[in-house]
């Protein structure tokens, strides 16, 4: 499930390969991926245009064009981007394809079709409903400890849940919520009202650390299985520290993993 670090990695892929290239044509093999648009409308809006910039906001990419429009991409559960040069093999599950002059192509792939692509005729992020409602970015300097503390103290729910409310903190999902709780030594099913001041401070610091490390690693975390819980989530997963079997619990309909020894 792409969360903030995974979407940032996709942003880098698009920025490195697709910016400044003139779009020759757009193909949409599966129109179910489109939101508020038809394949013909998407093609009309982008044919002959160029992508000028790409930003990440929470779990979304905002791809700006030289026609004063924004291509919005949400990756759902299994969405990804693949860039290929002319003659290279087309990836499986390609749902939207942006062909550039010269024959190269940016593919949006999505086996399970939970992602969405939309084109907005605006340059203002706040004109996009999905973006306007989002909370602050957890890695921004503006998201201070005071703001984080206000979020935690202002909502009576579990730690796991409050970290994933996109209107409060943008970009954290199921896996990174677990990782933040693990690194802070706090059970994800703890009520926010039970957290001490020290635990809240530790959660804030570990949130920043976890997300920064994941972004720096391009969200490829398997090499850190001796430090992180994410590579160890799943059946028979063990705590990297104690090697105890991880506990699994459903919290508000979401599956969470934690170490019953390390996390209190």
Language model features with spans:
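Structured catalytic/nucleic-acid-binding cores of DNA maintenance enzymes
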Residues: 1-264
């Amino acid at each position: 499930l792409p969360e903030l670090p995974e979407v940032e990695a996709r942003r880098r892929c698009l920025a490195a390969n697709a910016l400044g290239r003139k779009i020759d044509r757009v193909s949409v093999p599966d129109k179910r991926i489109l939101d508020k648009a038809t394949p013909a409308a998407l093609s009309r809006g982008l044919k002959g245009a160029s992508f000028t910039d790409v930003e990440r906001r929470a779990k979304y990419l905002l791809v700006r064009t030289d026609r004063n429009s924004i291509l919005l991409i949400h990756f759902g559960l299994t969405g990804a981007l693949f860039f290929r040069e002319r003659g290279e093999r087309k990836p499986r599950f390609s749902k939207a394809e942006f062909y550039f002059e010269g024959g190269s192509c940016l593919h949006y792939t999505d086996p399970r079709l939970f992602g969405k692509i939309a084109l907005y005729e605006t340059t203002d992020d706040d004109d996009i409903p999905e973006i306007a409602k989002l909370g602050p970015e957890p890695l921004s300097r503006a998201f201070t400890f005071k703001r984080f503390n206000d979020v935690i103290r202002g909502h009576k729910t579990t730690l796991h849940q409050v970290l994933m409310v996109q209107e409060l903190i943008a970009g954290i999902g199921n896996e990174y919520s677990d990782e933040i709780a693990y690194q802070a030594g706090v059970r994800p099913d703890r009520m926010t009202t039970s957290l001490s001041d020290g635990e809240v401070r530790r959660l804030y610091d570990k949130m920043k650390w976890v997300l920064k490390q994941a972004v720096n690693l391009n969200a490829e975390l398997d090499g850190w299985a001796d430090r992180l819980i994410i590579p160890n989530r799943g059946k028979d997963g063990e705590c990297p520290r104690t090697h105890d079997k991880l506990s699994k619990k459903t919290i508000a309909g979401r599956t969470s993993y934690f170490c019953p020894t390390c996390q209190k």
